[in-house]
Amino acid sequence: MKKWLIYLLSAVLILVYFFIIILPVVDSLSGHIARKEAERQVEQIQVSMEALWDTRGDELTFIADSVLLLHEQYQYPTSFHLYPGGEKSIRPTKILSKPTVLYNQLYNAITQFSQNSEIEFAQIFYANKNPFYYPQDSCVFRYIIKVDDDEYCHCDLIYSPNWEQHKQDGNICDPFGNDLSKRVADDWYVVVLYPYEYY
């Protein structure tokens, strides 16, 4: 009986060790790998965007080409969502009512392109109430990048003529006060945040 008891206790201790020590380490390592993969993908996107801007130079063409770039590189399934002012909606009338010529141009260019494209998840919104504290005079086009089965990051392409001034004034571009932006063209910036809950 004592041997069986010893075997049983040993098995219990092994299980406890596995669930308390091994699994958290494996989960942490998986998260680290997912983050590195997201960083690698985002770096590729940033480099490609810079190359697009160098060859194009036109803002609307730049937007459309960057959408095409993601489609060609990652072959995302179709889904298109619109976030005017950070408020979930898919009603174009709500967006078109915004008194911003650039915003409407971006909306028209992207929606026209999206009819024949396949994008995992895209948003465009005028940044007046969005939860990531972008300047109110900016316009944001967001890509949700799938890293693996349950890991996502988002890559925001931002048009903001006064971005540098907002940074000097102490405005932040994520909820934690971190400046994660990278300038990719005149008045265009990329901000990457991850992981991101997929909704």
Which residues does each predicted region cover?
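Generic preference for well-ordered secondary structure
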Residues: 9, 33, 44-47, 168, ...
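N-terminal export/targeting and maturation segments
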Residues: 20-118
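Alpha-helical interaction segments
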Residues: 6-8, 43, 178-179
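Generic detector of bulky aromatic hydrophobic side chains
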Residues: 7, 20, 24-27, 188, ...
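Extracytosolic and intramembrane catalytic regions of membrane-associated proteins
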Residues: 73-199
